[in-house]
Amino acid sequence: MDIDKIDQIIDEHQGEASSLIQVLLAIQSENHWLPKEALERVSEKLQVPLIRVQHIATFYKAFSLVPKGRHEIHICMGTACHVRGAMRVLETVQDLTGIKPGETDLDLKFSLETVNCLGCCALGPVMEIDGRTHGKMAAGETADVLKSYE
């Protein structure tokens, strides 16, 4: 991510230190992760100590300090999804992508995470990709859903 884009994001938030989280979220959304150089630039431009920026970036699960895939897959493992076959959906995603929860594939296409609940229990098992919910998933249709994100 280039410095000009980071500066543009900061300027959109009026360069206010109180907008630190919003700035980091915007950079994360644009870049899919927070590179060290971005944290340093945010620290400098917002006049917030780098240690504070790093603290925020490591405290919230929404932020990543390592590259993430263009598409983030979340598999709900809550009780309702679990009893309806979430594990089979997870295993299928792992087989198709070659990654496990917490990993990103080598071509930075997919990152995979499990979550405790996505809040749509009646649709279980649920897979969310880039914020889009796919409900009543079966292992067989998982491949078709993933192909639509290639």
Please tell me what each predicted stretch does.
Residues 1-150:
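Signature of N-terminal electron-transfer/Fe-S-associated modules in redox systems
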